């Protein structure tokens, strides 16, 4: 068993010139601090001792690291007078896919000028993310939890490969809810839901909709058009979906079964209403008095 050596700030530091730092916007500076503190926390979780220097305190407090008359990342602790040397620092380079938009937040590869040798595998690691991943792998720790399936993972710095399992074949992802879609057209729909945008407006009543298909369906309520007719009873519907749902009542099909009572329903609306009764949920609230109801029909 190898003893864990003491790690100083120099071992996990990232170096920029003053000119490079000045060119960074607020989001990139925040990203820098987050990456630095994350590297430190990973090493602490693995049992390494981190000497808490003035710089780390500055990072934790979110303070500016450049100060007039001082070099970038120079430790101002009186016990340590020498500035951190460039040869022992880590450079941060952006890695952006060729097909990625320019506005995409950059991912980071922290490259060591002096390779680190893993005691367990004997491999030389040149990236700080590789070092931490190597240490996590040998320790058996899995501190990252997948949002999609709850699976524990050892790779905290690069959870994307696992994430791709859940989004396989779906390359368009909403940056607000993380839901993935197979094409960009389908991605636009949830974005409108988040933003509240309703670009399709009825010229008769001025009611607005997020989708063109919803507008066309609404316009039929003004014209009275019901093109979908049941061959058995003659009842007509605005949408083909409503006709198919109605036809199930003639066939006696009941596709929706309640897990609690075992009761079956031919329509999803009836199934949802039954489920609300079991849960006690009252999602329909009166805007005037605030009283809530389980069913929308009770509210009306």
From Swiss-Prot:
Q: Name one Pfam family in it.
A: zf-C2H2
Q: Can you list the GO cellular component terms from the UniProt entry?
A: nucleus
Domain of life of the source:
Eukaryota
Which residue numbers delimit the C2H2-type Zn fingers? Answer: 172-194, 200-222, 228-250, 256-278
The answer to keyword Transcription regulation applying to this record is yes
Q: Which InterPro entries match?
A: KRAB, KRAB_dom_sf, Znf_C2H2_sf, Znf_C2H2_type
UniProt entry keywords in alphabetical sequence: DNA-binding, Metal-binding, Nucleus, Repeat, Transcription, Transcription regulation, Zinc, Zinc-finger
Q: Does the keyword Transcription regulation apply?
A: yes
**Which biological process annotations from GO are given for this protein?**
regulation of transcription by RNA polymerase II
**Sequence ranges assigned to domain KRAB in this UniProt record:** 7-78
Q: Name one GO molecular function term.
A: RNA polymerase II transcription regulatory region sequence-specific DNA binding
- What Gene3D superfamilies does the entry give? 6.10.140.140, Classic Zinc Finger
> Where does this polypeptide localize?
Nucleus
Q: Which family does it belong to?
A: Belongs to the krueppel C2H2-type zinc-finger protein family.
Any idea what job this protein has?
May be involved in transcriptional regulation.
* Protein name as catalogued: Putative zinc finger protein 705EP
Q: Which gene encodes it?
A: ZNF705EP
């Amino acid at each position: 068993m190898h003893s864990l050596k003491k790690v100083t700030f120099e071992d996990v530091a990232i170096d920029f010139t003053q000119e490079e730092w000045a060119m960074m916007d607020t989001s990139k500076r925040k990203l820098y601090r987050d990456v630095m503190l994350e590297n430190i926390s990973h090493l602490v979780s693995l049992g390494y001792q981190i000497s808490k220097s003035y710089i780390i305190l500055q990072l934790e407090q979110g303070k500016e690291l450049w100060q007039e008359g001082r070099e970038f990342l120079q430790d101002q602790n009186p016990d340590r007078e020498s500035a951190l040397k460039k040869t022992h620092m880590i450079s941060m380079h952006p890695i952006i896919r060729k097909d990625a938009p320019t506005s995409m937040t950059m991912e980071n590869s922290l490259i060591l000028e002096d390779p680190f040798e893993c005691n367990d595998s004997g491999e030389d690691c040149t990236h700080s993310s590789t070092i931490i991943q190597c240490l996590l792998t040998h320790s058996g720790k899995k501190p990252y939890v997948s949002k999609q399936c709850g699976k524990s993972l050892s790779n905290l710095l690069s959870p994307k490969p696992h994430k791709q399992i859940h989004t396989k074949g779906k390359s368009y992802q909403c940056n607000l809810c993380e839901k993935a879609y197979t094409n960009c057209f389908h991605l636009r729909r949830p974005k409108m839901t988040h933003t509240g945008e309703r670009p399709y407006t009825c010229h008769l009543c001025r009611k607005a909709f997020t989708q063109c298909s919803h507008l066309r369906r609404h316009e039929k309520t003004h014209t009275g058009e019901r093109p979908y007719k049941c061959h058995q009873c003659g009842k007509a519907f605005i949408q083909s979906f409503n006709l198919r749902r109605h036809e199930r009542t003639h066939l006696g099909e009941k596709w929706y079964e309640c897990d609690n009572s075992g009761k079956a329903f031919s329509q999803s609306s009836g199934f949802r209403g039954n489920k609300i009764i079991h849960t006690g949920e009252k999602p329909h609230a009166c805007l005037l008095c605030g009283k809530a109801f389980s069913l929308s029909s009770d509210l009306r």
